[in-house]
Amino acid sequence: MQFRYVVTGLAVVMSLAGCQRTSYDYNNNGSNNPGYTPPLQAQPVPSVQSGALPPPDGASGSQFPSAPASAAPGGVNVASAAPPATALDVTKESMVGNWRVSNGGANCDMFLTLTNLGSGSRGGTRGCSGELTAMGSWEVSGKMVLFKNRSGDTIGRVYKSADARFDGTTNSGQPLSLSR
């Protein structure tokens, strides 16, 4: 007999032996087994009261703070600002792929595709915070790349500052950089 048949037979026997029931008695009443714990009995549930909660102490009419203004300090909407004169030309095809994003000191990933979505192309982020979490599409407009949320509103824009680098801002004025 060949050795491989012996090994195969032993493996089958060992596997079947492992499938055998243990000697533990699941119907044990505890008299023979000192480690047996009886099951817990169901307890009645008290009735539930319903009603409006009182407002917290010192609360105003709204529990949420007011939304920040859409314009940056100085009254200029940063996302609608024109690119600098030193901005390089950009094509849609050169943007496709994975980008490393630096947004206000935090890093995350951005993925850009050529799949049509509304007036732009599909895109998304992973690990980002703030406005970039809502990114759903992007498009090239002149020398700028616009990032849009799922509603189609521009949430940020960048311009090409070097061969594999883009710089710009989000609508809230946070600095935004893309690099490969």
From Swiss-Prot:
Compartment(s) where it occurs, according to its Swiss-Prot or TrEMBL record: Cell outer membrane
Segments for region (Disordered): 28-78
Covalently lipidated residues, kind N-palmitoyl cysteine: 19
Keywords, alphabetical: Cell outer membrane, Lipoprotein, Membrane, Palmitate, Signal
InterPro entries according to UniProt: Inh/Omp19 (IPR021140), OM_lipoprot_Omp19_bac (IPR010571), Protease_inh_b-brl_dom (IPR016085)
Domain of life: Bacteria
Lipidation (S-diacylglycerol cysteine): 19
A Pfam cross-reference name: Inh
GO molecular function: endopeptidase inhibitor activity
Membrane topology qualifier: Lipid-anchor
Cleavable signal peptide: 1-18
Amino acid composition bias (Low complexity), ranges on this chain: 58-78
Gene Ontology CC: cell outer membrane
Protein family membership: Belongs to the rhizobiaceae omp19 lipoprotein family.
Protein name as annotated: Outer membrane lipoprotein omp19 homolog
Organism field: Agrobacterium fabrum (strain C58 / ATCC 33970) (Agrobacterium tumefaciens (strain C58))
